[in-house]
Amino acid sequence: MDLLNRFPNTVPFSEDIGFIAKVDDSEEGGNDYAFFVTVHEVAHQWWAHQVIGADVLGSTMLSESLSEYVSLKVIEQVNGKKKMRKFLKRALDEYLTSRTFERKRENALMYNDGQGYIHYQKGSLIFYALSDYIGEKTLNKALSKYVKKVAFQEPPYTTSIDLVNHIKEVTPDSLNYLIKDMFETITLYQNRIIETKSKKLDNGKYKVDIEFKVSKYRNNEKGRAFYGAEERDSITYQSDDMKKPEYSVFLKDYIDIGIFGKDEDDNEKEIELYLKKHKILSLIHI
């Protein structure tokens, strides 16, 4: 039987959770999950022991999602961002897979009904991404202010709405769409690269042309996709050779565009050549 819990000054482990773990400490290896879950449980000394959410929808965002966020940031400091990309990709895959087996309903993160794949996998992705968009110091400042306000609170207890309001206060107007996409709705992307071309320049650098598509859509609690028709905020694209148009929720999004290479001496080692956010306003970009 797996066991993992936390008490004041104590984090008990069962053997299945950590003691028989085989950790690959190499640069190409994965993250030390025993270390990760230990950090998660220690983080509960703040998120669940000091900040106690009311027994309503979204309460596990305050405990589990924020403990996951703390774990990610500690892992990032110890292992670097390269390994974080592996962890985040796995979390995304687990979220997308798990939601296909939902038998009840999937709510937005701040109204989640206690499903693990939402408050763990999706929650960790959202808070980590938010720290990347608005800045880690900015997000942590909002979290610190929130903790000071509600720590050891007597009933009525705090809710996810209160936390999201604190985050709104520090989010710039240009990124307000993130609050709706990340917390208030179920928002997904259908992004893909259509074509790439590269040319070596005389100075030894490369010019890279990328044609890509960015499309954003929402899901209701039963998994039905819609593209903003309920709010009349959708956009479309249709080329001459397309039988049907493609749709997207109205775009004003900052999307990461990256180019990665392999180390000449170590083909398994990934090298970041370019990574920058670009503001996207339409579906197709060349």
Where are these regions (language model features)?
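Hydrophobic alpha-helical and helix-loop surface patches within well-folded domains
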Residues: 1-211, 219-221, 225
